[in-house]
Swiss-Prot record:
Keywords: Late protein, Viral genome ejection through host cell envelope, Viral long flexible tail ejection system, Viral penetration into host cytoplasm, Viral release from host cell, Viral tail assembly, Viral tail protein, Virion, Virus entry into host cell. Its main location: virion. It comes from Escherichia phage T5. This is Tail tube terminator protein p142. The keyword Transmembrane does not apply.
Amino acid sequence: MDHRTSIAQAMVDRISKQMDGSQPDEYFNNLYGNVSRQTYKFEEIREFPYVAVHIGTETGQYLPSGQQWMFLELPILVYDKEKTDIQEQLEKLVADIKTVIDTGGNLEYTVSKPNGSTFPCEATDMIITSVSTDEGLLAPYGLAEINVTVRYQPPRRSLRR
């Protein structure tokens, strides 16, 4: 996998691992492994809550001496269905995912080379850039979007001039 795909998968793995019900003093919700990179329509989701991590826009900052920073947007969609107060439930899910992002440290991931070998990498920074919900428009369903910017530095490549 390349950097973009590997970072998104590492985020899926982190959310799934942290919100597995083993830390009831840290998280309101247990996702029961309902986290992936796949998006579904509400009717296609069999178990709620469900979290989907997407690969968004990537921008780069090129610096002297061949250094560069890459900034990858990861839109995280949170789906839920609640019989009582869907907005309150969505806010708890958003709070849990924000906790995962804010307290998890650097995001470690593995990148594959064309020859099949792999090498470990690390995203150095994650920033939550926006959070929005449907504000009850989809009741009894609920949808929230959390946009996260992940900053990483790809391996330095020699300059050919």
